[in-house]
Amino acid sequence: MQVPKNNIYTVSRLNGEVRQILEGQLGKVWLNGEISNFSAPSSGHWYLTLKDHYSQIRCAMFKGRNQSVSFKPVNGQQVLVKGAISVYEPRGDYQLLIESMLPAGDGLLAQQFEALKMKLAAQGLFAADTKRQLPKNIQRIGVITSPSGAAIRDVLHVLARRDPSIEVIIYPTQVQGESADLNICQAINIANQRLEVDVLLLTRGGGSLEDLWCFNSEALAHTIYNSALPVVSAVGHEVDTTISDYVADVRAPTPSAGAELLSQDSDNKSQRLATVLSRLKQSASHYQLKQERRLSLLEHRLQRLDPKRTLQQFEQRFDEMQLRLEAALSNKLHGLSRRQQQLASRLEQQSPKHKLALETNRLSYLATRLQDAMQDTLNQSEQRVKYAAHQLETVSPLATLSRGYSITTDANHQVIDNAAQLSVGDKINTRLRHGQVQSTVTQITDES
């Protein structure tokens, strides 16, 4: 065997080129499969295997991608994934890197069922206090179902066996497939418009989750909730549960159980009827005896009554009421008179003439007070002026002159208090108590 010299691959190179070929050729793919070997380590990444009956492929979904998945995958679950084919080069493993994941088949329907269930529960459609009691004496049952299905046969058979007197009115509708929920809503609305039955039985036989899906409709849930007639939901087998079961006033596990719930056994019904009749007879007899005793008592009282005495009592009663009425009228008139006097007095006090007199007196009083206050103010001001004049006179230079002193100033009117301020020949002015003297300095003597 001849070995080529230039075209020998390393393992890393081979795995790298395989990865490039796979990623470049296939790109993004959608894949449907069953989960196995699922693991979620502390890193937050998911590792799993997707398989069908013949093959399997390893998959990885990293933390940044799996955080958008609205459910927790489990082994055995069918899922629909979108991802890119790649190769994990360190081991040479071919794998799918998942970007998005959805439940597939019944898994998706189950997820939608739980989401709608939570939404309607939050809106109060399942609340126990909104459930209506079923009528006690049901005469007519409205059955909403397919007229050709097994459910209607079971219902009619049970009713015929237990209570043939019950009348059945069928509101035919589609109970499977597209737009079946709208047909059921229409049948319920027709029954509510006619109001010809006592209760509605919504029913169909068993089937897959997909077969029963029309009973998981939000529109149907609101129609059942708003129905004026009580609704019993009897859909599928005992293990089947639909949204209509939660919203209905009563849930029955099967169509036959729904019919039994709404009917009474003939033997038991006859026995109960006999019991009711017996009680009615006893009640009638007791009532008759009671009325007879009451009639006898009234006859005895009537014999004891004297019409003349009764008339006198009424006359006396009339006189008493007349006196009380006269006293009440007198008191009322007296009260009205006092009220009138009070109002007249208040009116006089509120009259403009009275108010004018009051304001005139008040103005005169205020004028007197103002004049007195002004006189007091003038007297006080005069005293303050006299006191200030006396104080000024005490410190005034003129007061000093009156005691024989004089004030000498130079030509610039500056007071001379030192001979050194003058020179021979300066003109000076001497102010006496009476008059002034103009002088010329001829000699200066320093006495310091």
UniProtKB/Swiss-Prot annotation:
EC numbers: 3.1.11.6
First-listed, main subcellular location of the protein, grouped into a coarse class: cytoplasm
UniProt xrefs under InterPro entries: Exonuc_VII_L, Exonuc_VII_lsu_C, OB-fold_nuc-bd_dom
Gene Ontology molecular functions: exodeoxyribonuclease VII activity; nucleic acid binding
Catalyses which reaction(s): Exonucleolytic cleavage in either 5'- to 3'- or 3'- to 5'-direction to yield nucleoside 5'-phosphates
CC per GO annotation: cytoplasm; exodeoxyribonuclease VII complex
GO biological process: DNA catabolic process
UniProt-annotated location(s): Cytoplasm
Pfam families xrefs: Exonuc_VII_L, tRNA_anti_2
Class of the enzyme per the UniProt entry, highest EC level: hydrolase
Keywords assigned by UniProt, alphabetized: Cytoplasm, Exonuclease, Hydrolase, Nuclease
HAMAP family attached to this UniProt entry: Exonuc_7_L (MF_00378)
Summary of the function given for this chain in its UniProt record: Bidirectionally degrades single-stranded DNA into large acid-insoluble oligonucleotides, which are then degraded further into small acid-soluble oligonucleotides.
PANTHER family: EXODEOXYRIBONUCLEASE 7 LARGE SUBUNIT
Family: Belongs to the XseA family.
Self-association state and partner proteins as the record states: Heterooligomer composed of large and small subunits.
NCBIfam families hit by this protein: xseA
Official protein name in the record: Exodeoxyribonuclease 7 large subunit
Species: Shewanella sp. (strain MR-4)
UniProt gene name: xseA
